Design a protein with these regions (language model features):
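Short, acidic/turn-prone active-site loops that include or flank metal/cofactor-
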Residues: 26-27, 51-52, 125-127, 194-196, ...
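General small-molecule cofactor/ligand-binding pocket signal
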Residues: 22, 45-49, 148, 163, ...
Length: 240
C-alpha cells in the first residue's frame, strides 16, 4: 500500500502496476487528476471514498489518496526465452489474449507453473489485474512464474517465431485436433478471451490453429480448463 500524492506518482514513474486507487471524495488537484487519469487509462479501478475510509487504511498523512501496488514484478519475454535456451531447455510459453477474469487468470497461472511453463504473456491493456483474488486462486504461483506484460502481442508472436518457437492457437475453430499435433519442440500456445476467443489478427500470424475435440453437446470450455488440457498434453508429449 502506498499513500500520499508524491509516493503514488513515484510508483507510477517506476513502472509498478497499480491494483486499485482510493481517492478522497470531493478532493480536487491537478496531481490527483493526473493520477486518476493514468489509472483509468490503464484500467485500474478508482474509488472515490469518504476520508474516514482512507483514515482506516492508514493513520499517516495520506493527502487524500491511497494506492495498492501489484504484488509481482513483470519480466520481459525477450530475456526469458534466451535464458531458457541457455539452460539447455526448450522454451514453453503461454500467451493469453484478453483473459480478464482474475480467478481464471489465477487458475491458469497455477496450472502453468505445475506444467513447467517458462512464461505467461499478457497484453498491457485488456488483461486481468494481478490482485489479491488472482494471487489466492493461483495458490502463490503468480509470485513464482514469469509473467511478461507486452505492448504488442503481434510483435511478441513474431519474436517467438524468430526465436524458434512454434506458436499455436487453440480454439473451437481449429482445423486439427490437439492429439494430432507435435507439441514436443519449443512452443508457445495461445488461449483466447472468455467472450471473444482469439483475435483474428493473431490467428493470421500463428503457425497452427488447433482444437480440443469435444464429443458432447457443449462446444467450448472455460479458458482455465482448456489451458490445463493443452499444457499437460505438451507435458505428456515431452515426457514421451
Amino acid at each position: 500500500m502506498v499513500f500520499g500524492v508524491h509516493p503514488v506518482e513515484e510508483v507510477i514513474k517506476a513502472g509498478k502496476e497499480l491494483e486499485k486507487v482510493f481517492v478522497q471524495s470531493g478532493l480536487r488537484s491537478q496531481q490527483i487528476s493526473e493520477i486518476v487519469k493514468y489509472a483509468k487509462n490503464h484500467e485500474v479501478p478508482v474509488q472515490f471514498v469518504p476520508i474516514e475510509k482512507l483514515n482506516r487504511l492508514t493513520r499517516k498523512n495520506h493527502q487524500g489518496i491511497v494506492a495498492f501496488v501489484c504484488p509481482i514484478s513483470y519480466q520481459t519475454i525477450e530475456n526469458v526465452v534466451p535464458m531458457v535456451y541457455d539452460e539447455g531447455r526448450m522454451p514453453f510459453v503461454v500467451i493469453l489474449d484478453r483473459v480478464t477474469d482474475v480467478r481464471n487468470f489465477g487458475a491458469i497461472a497455477r496450472t502453468c507453473y505445475a506444467a513447467g511453463v517458462d512464461a505467461i504473456v499478457i497484453p498491457s491493456r485488456g488483461s486481468a489485474l494481478i490482485n489479491g483474488d488472482a494471487m489466492k486462486t493461483s495458490a502463490g504461483a503468480l509470485s513464482l512464474i514469469n509473467v511478461c506484460r507486452v505492448e504488442n502481442i503481434k510483435d511478441t508472436i513474431d519474436f517467438l517465431k524468430a526465436s524458434g518457437l512454434k506458436v499455436i492457437a487453440f480454439s473451437e475453430k481449429g482445423k486439427q485436433t490437439i492429439w494430432q499435433a507435435d507439441l514436443t519442440g519449443p512452443i508457445a500456445i495461445m488461449m483466447g478471451s472468455e467472450e471473444d476467443g482469439i483475435s483474428e489478427a493473431y490467428l493470421k500470424r500463428v503457425d497452427d490453429h488447433l482444437v480440443i475435440p469435444m464429443p458432447g453437446d457443449i462446444d467450448s470450455l472455460n479458458v482455465s480448463v482448456a489451458t490445463g488440457i493443452v499444457t499437460f498434453e505438451v507435458v505428456r508429449q515431452r515426457l514421451g
